[in-house]
């Protein structure tokens, strides 16, 4: 039990240190959205709370081809908050190919990975050209249709920010943990 108590103390101190780092920092939070209005609306509360943890914050949203009201939602967000930047466009492309001739899961196909990389380059353009890289200290990329985020987890990461340049979330695929999907 002594070790557990020491761990809890270390964890609390690290979260507190993260809060201090965040409160002195400028952040850009980047999201890509398509046909996820319901989940995105739920996560906007978290994103708003996360933004308040920083001295300054920007929210960059890249939206494409939504037909469920997501496009209209993100456009209204930009209209009401000068710290929100929206890049919305239509490609007419399918989200995922139905089936690959090679048998590869379409979620991990070259087609989808290339498309997602191009979309991510769009928010990098917004960061570089519209916001300015000198105006931010950190970039957080969030998948806004994830079921739940941990604010303490993010604070904990910032509490150790002297040890890292990049932090990546641990996700789970439908195929199980530690399954090589590529």
Label every PLM stretch briefly.
Residues 28, 33, 42-51, 58-60, ...:
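Preference for well-ordered, secondary-structure-rich cores of eukaryotic proteins
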Residues 42, 46, 73, 118, ...:
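Alpha-helical elements of Rossmann-like donor-binding domains used by nucleotide-donor carbohydrate transfer enzymes
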Residues 1-49:
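N-proximal low-complexity "stem/linker" segments adjacent to membrane-targeting elements
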Residues 55-65, 87-91:
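Short beta-strand/loop segment that forms part of the nucleotide-sugar
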Residues 69, 73-136:
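Active-site-proximal specificity loops/subdomain of glycosyltransferases
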Residues 35-43, 77, 144, 158-162:
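Catalytic phosphate/metal-binding cores of nucleic-acid and nucleotide-processing enzymes, i.e., regions
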Residues 146-182:
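Conserved catalytic core of nucleotide-sugar-dependent glycosyltransferases
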């Amino acid at each position: 039990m002594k070790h557990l108590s020491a761990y809890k103390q270390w964890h609390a101190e690290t979260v507190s240190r993260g809060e201090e780092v965040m409160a002195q920092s400028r952040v850009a939070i980047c999201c890509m959205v398509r046909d996820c209005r319901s989940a995105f609306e739920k996560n906007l509360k978290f994103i708003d709370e996360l933004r308040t943890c920083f001295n300054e914050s920007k929210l960059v949203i890249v939206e494409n081809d939504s037909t469920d009201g997501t496009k209209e939602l993100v456009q209204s967000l930009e209209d009401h908050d000068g710290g929100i930047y929206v890049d919305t466009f239509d490609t007419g492309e399918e989200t995922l190919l139905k089936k690959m001739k090679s048998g590869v899961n379409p979620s991990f196909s070259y087609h989808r990975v290339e498309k997602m990389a191009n979309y991510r380059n769009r928010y990098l353009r917004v960061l570089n050209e519209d916001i300015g890289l000198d105006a931010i200290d950190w970039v957080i990329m969030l998948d806004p249709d994830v079921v739940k985020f941990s604010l303490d987890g993010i604070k904990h990461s910032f509490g150790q920010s002297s040890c890292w340049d990049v932090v990546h979330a641990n996700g789970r695929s439908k195929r199980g943990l530690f399954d090589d999907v590529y």
